[in-house]
UniProtKB/Swiss-Prot annotation:
Pathway as given in its UniProt record: Cofactor biosynthesis; NAD(+) biosynthesis; iminoaspartate from L-aspartate (dehydrogenase route): step 1/1
Record-listed NAD(+) binding positions: 119, 175
Organism: Methanospirillum hungatei JF-1 (strain ATCC 27890 / DSM 864 / NBRC 100397 / JF-1)
Keywords annotated in UniProt: NAD, NADP, Oxidoreductase, Pyridine nucleotide biosynthesis
Record protein name field: L-aspartate dehydrogenase
Lineage start: Archaea, Methanobacteriati, Methanobacteriota, Stenosarchaea group, Methanomicrobia
């Protein structure tokens, strides 16, 4: 059974901690201690107000469900303390210098950095970009204006550009673009739309390359209590954790 420490006790953290299947939650940490203590009462795992005390506990992998800033602050320390790390706020890895530092630490410690599929599907197949030519990648994401902190009366283009620039402007909303870029080993063109007519998050992905062409549409229900996050993102973490201890692993 995989033992995890949970860094981040907000909405996604609550979903993870209350759906333990194939793993157990051994420790909780949040920069807001009240959040960790509340989740501790729900799932029975101990909460820690001090990060060093948290990371010293006996678990195999630390699951980050907090923020891009939390990844930058804590991910290197997690690896240095001999833990694998699962990063949900993958937007932090859009910084190439930080990504290199993190990979160097992981190699030196013999540990893994796990990136879940998050709010989209198809990443497993699109990893062929690491061994085969990719010509173009477009991600068109549509969300409610409220989830983007906008007030508009009609469908409005909030951003058009590259993934590494989009994540700077919307660090809580478009982590999926960075996960896609890492998977396909290619720049991702991003269109982010605010649409008052939608109540779900929509991701349209268009990829062409040596393998052929792929078009993927994912229409997600927002995560409970947080319209900025897709419920599928939390479920993808649960799936990854369950697979870590499974004798049968499907996909590359």
């Amino acid at each position: 059974m995989v033992r995890i420490g949970l860094l981040g006790c907000g909405n996604v953290g609550r979903i993870i901690a209350t759906h333990q299947d194939g793993f157990t939650v051994e420790a909780l940490f949040d920069r807001l201690p009240d959040h960790a203590e509340e989740l501790a009462r729900m799932c029975g795992a101990p909460a820690y107000a001090d990060f060093q005390e948290f990371i010293s506990q006996d678990f195999d992998i630390c699951v980050e469900a907090a923020s891009v800033l939390a990844v930058r602050e804590y991910a290197p320390k997690i690896l240095e303390n001999g833990k694998h790390v699962l990063i949900l706020s993958v937007g932090a890895l859009s910084d190439t210098n930080f990504r290199k530092i993190l990979l160097d630490v992981a190699r030196s410690q013999g540990k893994k950095i796990h990136i879940p599929s998050g709010a989209i599907m198809g990443l497993d197949n699109l990893k062929v970009g690491g061994i085969s030519r990719i010509d173009s990648v477009l991600l068109r994401t549509t969300k409610s204006p409220a989830s983007l902190g906008m007030q508009v009366s009609h469908r409005t283009l909030a951003f058009r550009g590259k993934a590494n620039e989009c994540i700077k402007q919307f660090p809580k909303n478009i982590n999926v673009s960075v996960a896609l870029a890492l998977a396909v080993h290619h720049d991702v063109d991003v269109e982010l739309w605010a649409d008052p007519e939608v109540d779900r998050n929509i991701h349209d992905i268009f990829v062409s390359g040596e393998f052929g062409e792929a078009s993927i549409r994912v229409v997600n229900h927002p995560s409970p209590d947080n319209p900025a996050t897709s419920y599928l993102a939390a479920l993808s973490v649960l799936s990854l954790l369950k697979n870590l201890d499974s004798p049968l692993v499907i996909g590359s």
